[in-house]
Amino acid sequence: MNNRTIMAFDFGTRSIGAAIGQEITGTARALTSFKATDGIPNWGQIEKLLKEWQPDLVIVGLPLNMDGTEQFVTVQARKFANRLHGRFGVQVQLQDERLTTVEARAHLFDRGGYKALNKGKVDATSAVIILESWFEQRY
């Protein structure tokens, strides 16, 4: 098992959630979320986060339909992952993210009811779930 720092993004066309985790412990925590316009984030905010945490690997959630087929946002998520690699030179992997938003909403609702369900928290929590599922697949 490696001791890498891994960052995950929950890609969305209007908002992108971020989480950070350690491979050695297999744990992750929510960081923040960023507003996006048609899937395009403020790259300066992404750069600041990458410089602060210096991840060894970045995981980007890949939104698929329930039957595993791709949708329009799947293509945009792939572009986002490619741009992360191209702009910042980070190693990027894609991770199936089916139902992570549903799971994130349920988790947040259990902890704080409707007040906890703001979009930023949901997206950052979805990024945590994406990263934890990546850890689970490896160990």
Curated annotation (Swiss-Prot):
Gene3D superfamilies hit by this protein:
YqgF/RNase H-like domain
- The protein's enzyme class: hydrolase
Q: Which InterPro entries match?
A: RNaseH-like_sf (IPR012337), YqgF (IPR005227), YqgF/RNaseH-like_dom (IPR006641), YqgF/RNaseH-like_dom_sf (IPR037027)
CDD domains found in the cross-reference section: YqgF
Cytoplasm: present as a keyword of the record?
Answer: yes
User: GO CC terms for this protein?
Assistant: cytosol
What top-level branch of life does the organism fall under? Bacteria
Q: Which SMART domains match?
A: YqgFc (SM00732)
Q: Which SUPFAM superfamilies match?
A: Ribonuclease H-like
Question: Alphabetically, which GO biological process terms does the record hold?
Answer: rRNA 5'-end processing
EC number of this enzyme: 3.1.-.-
The keyword Nuclease is annotated on this UniProt entry? yes
Disulfide partners:
none
- GO molecular function per UniProt: nuclease activity
Principal localisation: cytoplasm
Cellular compartment(s): Cytoplasm
Assigned keywords, A-Z: Cytoplasm, Hydrolase, Nuclease, Ribosome biogenesis
Protein family membership: Belongs to the YqgF nuclease family.
The molecule here is called Putative pre-16S rRNA nuclease
Organism expressing this protein natively: Photorhabdus laumondii subsp. laumondii (strain DSM 15139 / CIP 105565 / TT01) (Photorhabdus luminescens subsp. laumondii)
State the encoding gene.
yqgF
